[in-house]
């Protein structure tokens, strides 16, 4: 087991060194794939088969398809200046551009699609102007866009975790809520507080909040309707978006030329290629079976059981993604820790969530770093301090909950 752990550590270190050296994440993942094949002795034929399957498997097609559709919707919103108008309406309603940087990404974050992060990026970029540097803009966009992912049942990871435990959705959301508040506050404390409030009405200007709300609804209704349909009808985003796009074409009166132009520019091959490479790495790493053996490493150690499972969840998620670790680890943790309940699930899922914010396998990070033209390492520099503070608070919160038998 120690040998396999060392192999995983070597692979992760190579990825970190390459991205910190400002090499493209794509190149780091290709190197990681080759290294995994060599270190774990995966037959070339099996590795080739896994990589080919990764191109056309359901998960890859869903991610790529959703990204293209969301990008198409983004093109409509950009062309009709809906994002700029929504950003201004939010500023007028709240009187604070910092709230725009929080509210818009969190709302859009309920939409479980990687491509939605670019819509958030456009809003944050416009709201912050030159008052945040490009690294800070990237962090704020990615960070607040993903907060909904920590608790919303619109995400597969949450549904998967709830399905394999006896914890109800209501319990989970209730006990995760304080940690969601912590996430919101930490982003403000670290970065957003340096922004001025921004928009203030002039002496002779009267803000009609009813009209501003109507303006906001006119700009955001495609996203709101998509989120409502996904939650209410339990549908995937890729099934809902074509309907939303057709409605948007009608409501915003797009010409045939505009539709064709948007369709052409919505296919961003660079991001699609990066997505496929990430899926290849995930599948090859899963094939090794090394992640499932990580709990053996902490057997008999002095580390408390909950902390051991937390460390494994955190590290395993960074390397292989959230879903695989949820399936592998949560049943083990609930079987091993007496009286495991909502508190343990919140602890493990929160760790999985923050681990995904620094995982090189997280597709959204590849997309948003490409959008703002920064490296993965630059984003990590802004993200890791926030995560360290959050994990400390989270651990204390779990100890408190477990003390009350939750």
Regions inferred by a protein language model and the residue ranges of each:
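Juxtamembrane helix-boundary/capping and inter-helix hinge elements in multi-pass membrane proteins
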Residues: 79-82, 92-96, 126-138, 162-170, ...
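Hydrophobic alpha-helical transmembrane segments of multi-pass integral membrane proteins
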Residues: 66-69, 91-123, 301-340, 345-356
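Flexible interhelical linker loops that connect adjacent transmembrane helices
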Residues: 194-220, 256-265
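Small-residue-rich segments of transmembrane alpha-helices in multi-pass membrane proteins
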Residues: 33-46, 98-103, 205-223, 268-283, ...
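C-terminal transmembrane helix pair
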Residues: 138, 143-146, 157, 172-185, ...
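Short helix-coil transition sites and intra-membrane helix breaks within transmembrane domains
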Residues: 25, 62, 74-81, 109-120, ...
């Amino acid at each position: 087991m120690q040998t396999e752990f060392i192999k995983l550590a070597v692979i992760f270190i190579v990825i970190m060194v390459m991205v910190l050296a400002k090499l493209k994440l794509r190149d780091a993942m290709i190197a990681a794939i080759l290294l995994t094949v060599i270190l774990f002795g995966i037959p070339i034929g099996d590795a080739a088969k896994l990589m080919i399957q990764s191109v056309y498997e359901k998960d890859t097609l869903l991610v790529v398809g959703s990204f293209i559709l969301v990008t198409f919707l983004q093109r409509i919103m950009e062309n009709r200046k809906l994002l700029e108008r929504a950003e201004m309406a939010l500023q007028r309603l709240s009187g604070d551009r910092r709230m725009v940087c929080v509210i818009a990404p969190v709302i859009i974050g309920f939409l479980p699609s990687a491509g939605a992060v670019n819509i958030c990026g456009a809003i944050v970029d416009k709201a912050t102007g030159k008052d945040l540097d490009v690294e800070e803009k990237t962090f704020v966009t990615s960070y607040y866009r993903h907060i909904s992912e920590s608790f919303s049942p619109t995400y597969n990871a949450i549904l998967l975790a709830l399905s394999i435990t006896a914890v109800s959705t209501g319990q989970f959301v209730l006990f995760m809520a304080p940690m969601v508040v912590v996430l919101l506050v930490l982003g403000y404390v670290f970065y957003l507080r340096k922004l001025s409030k921004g928009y203030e009405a002039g002496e002779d200007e009267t803000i009609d909040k009813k009209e501003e709300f109507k303006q906001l609804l006119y700009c955001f209704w495609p996203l709101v309707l998509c989120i409502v349909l996904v939650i209410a009808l339990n549908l995937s985003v890729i099934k809902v978006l074509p309907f939303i796009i057709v409605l948007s074409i009608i409501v915003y009166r797009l010409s045939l030329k505009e539709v064709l132009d948007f369709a052409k520019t919505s296919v961003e091959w660079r991001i699609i290629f990066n997505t496929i490479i990430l899926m290849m790495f995930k599948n090859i790493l899963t094939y090794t079976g090394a992640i499932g053996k990580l709990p053996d490493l902490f057997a008999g150690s002095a580390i408390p059981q909950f902390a051991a499972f937390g460390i494994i969840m955190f590290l395993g998620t960074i390397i292989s993604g959230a879903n695989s670790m949820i399936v592998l680890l949560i049943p083990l943790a609930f079987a091993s820790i007496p009286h495991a309940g909502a508190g343990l699930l919140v602890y493990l899922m929160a760790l999985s969530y923050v681990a995904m914010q620094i995982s090189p396998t997280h597709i959204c990070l590849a997309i948003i770093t490409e959008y703002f033209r920064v490296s993965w390492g630059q984003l990590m520099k802004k993200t890791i301090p926030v995560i360290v503070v959050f994990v400390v608070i989270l651990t204390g919160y779990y100890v408190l909950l477990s003390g009350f038998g939750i």
